Amino acid sequence: PYPPPEGTRQARKNRRRRWRARQRQIHSLGERILTTCLGRPTEPVPFLLPPIERLRIDCSEDRGDSDPQGVGDSQIPGKSCDLLGSGTKE
Protein backbone atom coordinates (compact mmCIF):
# COMPACT_ATOMS: atom_id res chain seq x y z
CA PRO A 1 0.00 0.00 0.00
CA TYR A 2 0.99 3.59 -0.56
CA PRO A 3 2.73 5.13 2.49
CA PRO A 4 0.55 7.05 4.96
CA PRO A 5 0.59 10.88 4.73
CA GLU A 6 1.94 11.54 8.23
CA GLY A 7 5.15 12.96 9.63
CA THR A 8 7.25 15.89 8.44
CA ARG A 9 7.51 16.89 4.82
CA GLN A 10 11.00 15.40 4.56
CA ALA A 11 9.89 12.13 6.19
CA ARG A 12 6.99 11.84 3.73
CA LYS A 13 9.32 12.55 0.82
CA ASN A 14 11.77 9.86 1.97
CA ARG A 15 8.94 7.36 2.53
CA ARG A 16 7.57 7.97 -0.96
CA ARG A 17 11.07 7.62 -2.45
CA ARG A 18 11.60 4.29 -0.66
CA TRP A 19 8.11 3.12 -1.67
CA ARG A 20 8.81 3.92 -5.36
CA ALA A 21 12.15 2.09 -5.16
CA ARG A 22 10.37 -0.95 -3.67
CA GLN A 23 7.76 -0.85 -6.45
CA ARG A 24 10.52 -0.72 -9.09
CA GLN A 25 12.22 -3.70 -7.45
CA ILE A 26 8.95 -5.69 -7.38
CA HIS A 27 8.30 -4.83 -11.03
CA SER A 28 11.79 -5.86 -12.18
CA LEU A 29 11.57 -9.10 -10.18
CA GLY A 30 8.24 -9.90 -11.84
CA GLU A 31 9.75 -9.26 -15.27
CA ARG A 32 12.68 -11.57 -14.46
CA ILE A 33 10.31 -14.33 -13.36
CA LEU A 34 8.20 -13.98 -16.51
CA THR A 35 11.27 -14.04 -18.73
CA THR A 36 13.27 -16.85 -17.13
CA CYS A 37 10.60 -19.21 -15.78
CA LEU A 38 7.79 -18.78 -18.26
CA GLY A 39 9.77 -17.74 -21.31
CA ARG A 40 7.54 -14.73 -21.85
CA PRO A 41 8.84 -11.41 -23.17
CA THR A 42 8.84 -8.50 -20.73
CA GLU A 43 7.05 -6.29 -23.26
CA PRO A 44 3.46 -7.24 -24.08
CA VAL A 45 2.87 -8.82 -27.47
CA PRO A 46 0.95 -6.39 -29.70
CA PHE A 47 -2.71 -7.33 -29.90
CA LEU A 48 -3.93 -7.41 -33.49
CA LEU A 49 -7.45 -6.08 -33.95
CA PRO A 50 -9.62 -6.86 -36.97
CA PRO A 51 -10.38 -4.03 -39.40
CA ILE A 52 -12.69 -1.40 -37.93
CA GLU A 53 -15.32 -2.15 -40.58
CA ARG A 54 -15.75 -5.66 -39.14
CA LEU A 55 -16.20 -4.53 -35.53
CA ARG A 56 -19.73 -4.14 -34.21
CA ILE A 57 -21.82 -4.55 -31.10
CA ASP A 58 -24.65 -6.94 -31.84
CA CYS A 59 -26.59 -8.73 -29.10
CA SER A 60 -27.95 -11.24 -31.61
CA GLU A 61 -24.46 -12.79 -31.85
CA ASP A 62 -24.94 -14.16 -28.32
CA ARG A 63 -28.12 -15.99 -29.35
CA GLY A 64 -26.55 -17.40 -32.50
CA ASP A 65 -28.93 -15.79 -35.02
CA SER A 66 -26.44 -13.43 -36.65
CA ASP A 67 -25.75 -13.42 -40.41
CA PRO A 68 -24.38 -16.68 -41.73
CA GLN A 69 -21.43 -15.00 -43.47
CA GLY A 70 -19.90 -14.07 -40.11
CA VAL A 71 -19.45 -10.41 -41.00
CA GLY A 72 -18.38 -8.58 -37.89
CA ASP A 73 -16.99 -11.69 -36.25
CA SER A 74 -13.96 -10.48 -34.32
CA GLN A 75 -13.09 -13.83 -32.76
CA ILE A 76 -9.82 -15.54 -33.51
CA PRO A 77 -10.47 -18.88 -35.26
CA GLY A 78 -10.10 -21.76 -32.83
CA LYS A 79 -10.24 -19.52 -29.75
CA SER A 80 -13.23 -19.08 -27.48
CA CYS A 81 -14.27 -15.55 -26.64
CA ASP A 82 -15.23 -15.53 -22.96
CA LEU A 83 -14.26 -12.02 -21.92
CA LEU A 84 -16.83 -11.48 -19.18
CA GLY A 85 -17.24 -15.06 -18.02
CA SER A 86 -20.49 -16.57 -16.82
CA GLY A 87 -21.02 -13.99 -14.08
CA THR A 88 -20.65 -16.48 -11.24
CA LYS A 89 -17.79 -16.47 -8.78
CA GLU A 90 -15.63 -19.56 -8.59
Curated annotation (Swiss-Prot):
Location(s) in or outside the cell: Host nucleus, Host nucleolus; Host cytoplasm
Main location as per UniProt: host cell
Phosphoserine: modified positions: S66
Superkingdom in the source lineage: Viruses
Alphabetical UniProt keywords: AIDS, Host cytoplasm, Host nucleus, Host-virus interaction, Methylation, mRNA transport, Phosphoprotein, RNA-binding, Transport
Modification after translation, per record: Phosphorylated by protein kinase CK2. Presence of, and maybe binding to the N-terminus of the regulatory beta subunit of CK2 is necessary for CK2-mediated Rev's phosphorylation. Asymmetrically arginine dimethylated at one site by host PRMT6. Methylation impairs the RNA-binding activity and export of viral RNA from the nucleus to the cytoplasm.
Residues spanned by motif Nuclear export signal and binding to XPO1: 47-58
InterPro entries: REV_protein
One Gene Ontology cellular component annotation held by this UniProt entry: host cell cytoplasm
Gene Ontology MF terms in the entry: DNA-binding transcription factor activity; RNA binding
Note from the entry: HIV-1 lineages are divided in three main groups, M (for Major), O (for Outlier), and N (for New, or Non-M, Non-O). The vast majority of strains found worldwide belong to the group M. Group O seems to be endemic to and largely confined to Cameroon and neighboring countries in West Central Africa, where these viruses represent a small minority of HIV-1 strains. The group N is represented by a limited number of isolates from Cameroonian persons. The group M is further subdivided in 9 clades or subtypes (A to D, F to H, J and K).
Entry comment, domain topic: The RNA-binding motif binds to the RRE, a 240 bp stem-and-loop structure present in incompletely spliced viral pre-mRNAs. This region also contains the NLS which mediates nuclear localization via KPNB1 binding and, when the N-terminal sequence is present, nucleolar targeting. These overlapping functions prevent Rev bound to RRE from undesirable return to the nucleus. When Rev binds the RRE, the NLS becomes masked while the NES remains accessible. The leucine-rich NES mediates binding to human XPO1.
Full protein name: Protein Rev
